[in-house]
Amino acid sequence: MSARAVTKRAAPAAMLVSQAVLNRLLADILDGRYPPGARLRFAELQAAYEVGIGTLREALSHLASVGMVEVDANRGFRVAPVSAADLQDVSSLLIEFEQRAILSSIENGDKAWEESVVLTFHRLAGIESRPRAERAERFNEWVALHRDFHHALVSACGSRWLLHMRALLHDHMERYRLLSQRHRPQGPGRLAEHAAIKDAALARRGAEAAELLRKQLQWTVDNVRRYAPQFIDPPG
């Protein structure tokens, strides 16, 4: 086998490793394993992800480009901080983009879109309908299914840039939501709330679906302010 052929086969494998590391690092930042403001030391990251510095630097540079990580002059990388002002900025923009996307999806959505909304809701409901203790045990699974459901709702909006910006803001909002999740008491499930959004979308009631999404996002903002003020408004 020629060196060129070996290189061609190795390149996709290297890309898969880089993407896997990026996904894991992002998930660990969102989940709080690396809290806001934490230094990201290469030695510790190499031990955690079992990859070289080049792969880590590539992943960290990408996360810096989307605002999840910051570059400290002469000190490497650190997790981006959080603040009340940033929460307000992220949430207000996300609400705007989410509402625009759901309205366009409802207008443009076809049978395949309807089926994806129903399927992702069904999977989400499979956890949200369970007892509180089981929901807590399956929280990480719920996070992924919740993301899938909300993506399905807006997936037919017809604008890749709107979807891209919405996904970026959603990740930042998820970090705030998970901060509050770790500090607030386990409440009732949100099955009825998600069912109402699903029903409004499938019935093509755009204004109602958009308002329900706004209320859900505002609920998240209120919970962050109530249960995680020490992160967004640290004492001076």
Regions found by a protein language model. Name each.
Residues 1-107, 221, 225-236:
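Short linear motifs at protein or domain termini
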Residues 111-178, 190-199, 208-219:
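Conserved amphipathic alpha-helical segments that form helical-bundle/coiled-coil interaction surfaces
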Residues 15-18, 110, 135, 139, ...:
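Flexible, glycine- and charge-enriched loops at secondary-structure boundaries
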Residues 83-84, 177-180:
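Short alpha-helical transmembrane interface motifs in multi-pass membrane proteins
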Residues 14, 79, 94, 142, ...:
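Residue-level marker of regulatory loop/turn positions in helix-turn-helix DNA-binding domains and
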Residues 106-107, 158, 182:
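Short helix-capping/hinge motifs at transmembrane helix termini and TM-loop junctions
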Residues 2, 24, 48, 182-236:
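C-terminal regulatory/effector modules of DNA-binding transcriptional regulators
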